[in-house]
Amino acid sequence: MKRDRERIRDLLVRLENDQNGVIIIGGVLNASVEEITDEYHLKLMADEGLVVETHHSGWRLTSIGHDAVEALSKLAFWEQLKSAGPKEAYELLKGATSSLAVAAISKLMGWG
């Protein structure tokens, strides 16, 4: 499965906007392709410390994840990042969020 930057951003925003701060994805025997893809991307995000699994199939943002979503949720900034080369995207991020979030996002998105 390929990494999907849009899906990662959408999941971060979805987590931040959730009333309970937790989304339930995965862990179902008959999961849809969408659920399997979301769970895969959440695990990639967990690898970089942006989210943690709270209980069976529940996911929440970490402090670094909140920093990341603050930067990536601004649509104009996101569009700028997507059109930038890896080095330029990394430099743009450095001015927009914490150093831990920059490192996590850059590695996850392939920009650093």
Language-model features: locations:
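Short amphipathic alpha-helical interface segments
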Residues: K2-A31
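Short alpha-helix boundary/capping elements
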Residues: E16-N20, L50, S73
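Short, mixed-charge amphipathic alpha-helical segments
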Residues: N30-E34, V51
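A short, conserved structural fragment
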Residues: K43-H56
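Short, amphipathic alpha-helical interaction segments positioned at domain boundaries
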Residues: S63-E88
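Leucine-rich, amphipathic alpha-helical/linker segments
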Residues: L81-G112
